[in-house]
Each structure stands twice: as C-alpha cells, then as structure tokens.
Amino acid sequence: VVVVVYDENGKIATGIPVKMYNEKDYKVFEKDNLTLPTAVARTNESGIATFILPQEEWFAAQSQRFFTFVVQEGGGPDNYQIWSSGRTVEAGKVVKIEIRLTQFPN
C-alpha cells in the first residue's frame, strides 16, 4: 500500500508518520485516539509512506482486508487533528491512497 501525503497547499509532505489500523484496532482508535497503530511508516522525500503487507501475515484467512490509514497531530481527549482514509486492500495488489492535510474545519 502506497500512501501519499500532501499539505494544505497541495505540496508533498515529508517526514510525516502515517499510521495503519486493521479493522479491529481502528474500532478501538475511534474511541481512544492514543491507541497504538497496527503498523506505522514515515513519508519519504517524495511524500510517500509504503506499507508492505505479506500475504501469509495479513491475508492468510481472507483475500481482502479493510485498513484505515491515519495522519494525526496531537492526541488525547482534546487538541488534536486527524486525517484518514480507509480502503479495502486485496492480497497481491498495489493500492494508492492520498491524504490531504487540510486545515480545520474542512
């Protein structure tokens, strides 16, 4: 899975941590934004965070999984901002997701 992160001006955002949550962990994250992610990757100089999901680990029981990718500033009960995109990922397929860090409220 390739996640491209852009800032509010549409420019690539480098060095940004992108969190990935599986179905179960995202339900917990929705109630507590300090929940540890299933996986995390940082955007490179091209604004791309790459998640490699080996079939035997992620798709052993099913050929498709729903993952949510999150960029978060701050955390806890207040003073935080979250941008996310959820997507069904099929084993063996490359998926490209874009997250735009728009300013609140948007």
Predicted regions, residues:
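Extracellular beta-sheet/turn segments enriched in Thr/Pro/Gly and aliphatic residues
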Residues: Y80-N106
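A short, amphipathic beta-strand motif
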Residues: V1-D7
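Surface-exposed coil/turn segments at beta-strand junctions on protein surfaces, enriched
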Residues: R42-S46, Q62, E90
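Short, ordered, surface-exposed loop/turn motifs in non-cytosolic proteins
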Residues: N9-L34
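A short, solvent-exposed beta-strand micro-motif common in secreted/extracellular proteins
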Residues: E57-P77
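A mature extracytoplasmic/lumenal domain signature
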Residues: P17, N22-K24, L53-E57, E73-G75, ...
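Short, acidic Ser/Thr/Gly-rich low-complexity loop/linker segments typical of extracellular
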Residues: V28-P54
